[in-house]
């Protein structure tokens, strides 16, 4: 099984790549700049998970394609079973052309997971791709993600690795009604029937927590 992640930020590396790798996927990260170069050199990202008392540190193997290499980036998306985006909701429009090219060349239905901390991220992607692919977009699945893990840091280590530091929770709620077969089986990912309710519950808990501190 193959997964492609557009973006090489904290959530892309510290959650999406880690969870997909643990579930048996060969992960390709599509990034740019110094982070992409370091990942390509080391062929892995160093993940550190800590709850303040215990710390776990391990390497997650990844392939890396620089977004400047359009042909390779499109090929990575076209050959993936699962595609993730983790670029920030405001940046999504900038990756829609690339995503459309890859999905157009995909031989089978692909599930796209938007790790964007935005209630309508999947809707934004689907709408943008419909303008580019027409009815062809309907054979693919598009879901947002309600993420429990906070990934606070992304740094370069002395030996040249990219290290991301987050907390241990691994649960990710996804929209089960928006997926297509074969549904991706990812450890910690929970398909639900009312995705919007879960997103708003997270938003309420986050806002309420900050309002009382």
How should these model regions be labeled?
Residues 1-4, 10-11, 16-213:
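Substrate/ligand-engaging "lid" and interaction regions
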């Amino acid at each position: 099984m193959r997964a492609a992640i557009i973006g090489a930020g904290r959530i892309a590396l510290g959650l999406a790549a880690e969870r997909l790798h643990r579930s048996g996927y060969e992960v390709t990260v599509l990034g740019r700049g110094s982070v992409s170069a370091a990942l390509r050199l080391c062929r892995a990202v160093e993940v550190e998970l800590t709850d303040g008392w215990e710390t776990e540190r391990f390497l997650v193997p990844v392939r890396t394609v620089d977004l400047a290499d359009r042909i390779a980036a499109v090929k990575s998306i076209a050959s993936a079973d699962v595609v993730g985006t983790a670029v920030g909701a405001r940046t999504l429009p900038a990756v829609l052309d690339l995503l459309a090219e890859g999905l157009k060349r995909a031989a089978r239905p692909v599930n796209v997971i938007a790790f964007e901390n935005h209630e309508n991220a999947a809707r934004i992607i689907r709408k943008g791709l419909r303008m580019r692919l027409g009815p062809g977009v309907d054979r693919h699945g598009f879901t947002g993600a309600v993420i429990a893990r906070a990934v606070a840091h992304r740094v370069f280590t002395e030996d040249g690795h990219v290290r991301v530091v987050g907390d241990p929770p691994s649960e990710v709620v996804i929209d089960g009604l928006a997926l297509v077969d074969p549904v991706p089986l990812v450890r910690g990912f929970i398909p639900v029937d009312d995705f919007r309710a879960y997103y708003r519950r997270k938003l309420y808990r986050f806002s309420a927590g900050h309002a009382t501190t």
